[in-house]
Each structure stands twice: as C-alpha cells, then as structure tokens.
C-alpha cells in the first residue's frame, strides 16, 4: 500500500492553506473543515489558535496525521498539542509520512476514534491522509461503499482503497 499512497500524495493537488501568499511567503490560513460523518471531520493544516474554534464547534479530540518538519510554514505538533490540552481536548499524534500507511497507524487511529468522548477532528496537509487513515480504520465496521461514499461526500476519493476496506 505504500506505493499506492505515494502516488496518491503526488496526485492529490489539495492544499492545507487556501493557496494565497502573504508578504512573508507563508500560507494565508483558512480553516476548511470537511465533515466525514457525525463523529469525524478533517481538514488541512491548522494553527494552534484554531483549537479554540474546534472546541467551540464541539470537537473533543484532535488527531494530527502530519509529521513535524514537513513544510517550513507548518507549526510544530507540540504547539497544537499544548493548545488542545489547554482547551481540554484530547490530542493524538499519529503522523503518516513518507513510509506510508501501515497496520499500526490504522490501529492507533481506530483506537483514538473509538476512545473519543465526542466528535473528532483530524488533520494533515490537505485532509487526504487523515481521510485515508479514517477509511482504513473503518474496514470491517462498515461496508466499503459506505466508507467510500462518506469520504466522497467530504470531497475525498477513496475508491482506490476498496480492496482494503473489505466487505461490500
């Protein structure tokens, strides 16, 4: 699945920021939540100051699927974790990097989702890695078509994972 994942990253084209640049070359931040279902939403990169908004929207946990140091304008996960903890939100660092998807990442995602007291917010650079880990964590829990449809409704094509998602 690693090769599949790398190809997907190259072709994704989505950005965690809205694409505009300011005078300092940093992305102009826009929080763009995409609802997968009543329990999970995803987006691209967030900033520590977004945590208060996430809390006000009713999220109880944050899953960070982006490795630190992936881009120069990316905040450290520790800063987002500190903001989450200060706001009373659970925080899970489950980075999906160049080594690709593996069973441990999927299991950790499933555990974090199942252990949450309420809605969970997941992020990476574009939301694609977060959606991929969510989809794979649902294998065997929901029909493959339902998983793929929920992701598609949020704007993510997970049809390439159908063989990994199990029952139809």
Task: Please place each PLM-identified region on the residue numbering.
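Cys-dependent protein tyrosine phosphatase-like superfamily
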Residues: 5, 16-120, 132-168
